[in-house]
A protein has these predicted regions:
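Hydrophobic helix-and-loop "lid/oligomerization" segment in the mid-to-C-terminal part
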Residues: 42-194
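Short alpha-helices
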Residues: 1-59
Length: 194
């Protein structure tokens, strides 16, 4: 295995490389190969971000081991209720400085909010997205995603959160969604002022 793991797209890519070192490819079960490939597909957003030569090598290795891409797709499917919730979140989005900011009125799970943030990146003209919502425990949070030059980690850090360049989050312990959205817009403005 190569020394540097900084260039890896995901933990699943690292595990795939480790498994190659530890045992024969035939020793990996099909379901294990599919789970690892699903992780790589998810973390790279279908091979569009943080993807390098090693990513494709790992995916090809898993495919040769027996991973079925149709089964991988099934592993990543969303149930109908979550899909509807995701699209309701997207309907609430407004474009501000190439950032889609969504603030649904309904209580949301963090998973669905993150999926909606991912989905908003498929819209032309959107370089980043931030979903601000309230979870089932009454906590206000933000889930941010980016595919371009815009670094959502820096925006979320201004709000007390963190993450990485393409995926970040923050939690607001002291305000409702409306106030959190105001803070998000201010953080976006500060980001662009630098």
């Amino acid at each position: 295995m190569q020394e540097s793991s900084r260039s890896l797209s995901s933990t699943c890519e690292l595990v795939t490389e480790l498994l190659q070192e530890l045992r024969e490819p035939a020793g990996i079960l099909r379901c294990e190969a599919e789970a690892l490939l699903a992780g790589i597909v998810l973390d790279t957003k279908s091979f569009t971000i943080r993807t390098g030569e090693r990513t494709f090598d790992a995916a090809a290795r898993l495919r040769r081991t027996g991973a079925d891409t149709a089964e991988v797709k099934k592993l990543l499917q969303t149930d109908m209720e979550d899909a509807i919730a995701k699209y309701k979140i997207m309907q609430s989005a407004q474009l501000y400085r190439k950032v889609a900011v969504a603030a649904p009125q309904e209580v949301q799970t963090r998973v669905v909010a993150a999926q909606a943030a991912d989905e908003l990146l498929n819209i032309s003209g959107v370089e980043a997205s931030i979903v601000v919502a309230r979870d089932g425990k009454g906590r206000t949070f933000a889930s941010a995603r980016s595919i371009g030059e815009l670094n959502v980690q820096l925006i979320m850090e201004r709000l007390g959160g963190g993450g990485n360049r393409s995926a970040a989050a923050a939690q607001f312990d002291d305000c409702d969604v409306k106030e959190a959205v105001k803070r998000v817009y201010a953080a976006i403005d500060e980001y662009f002022a630098e």
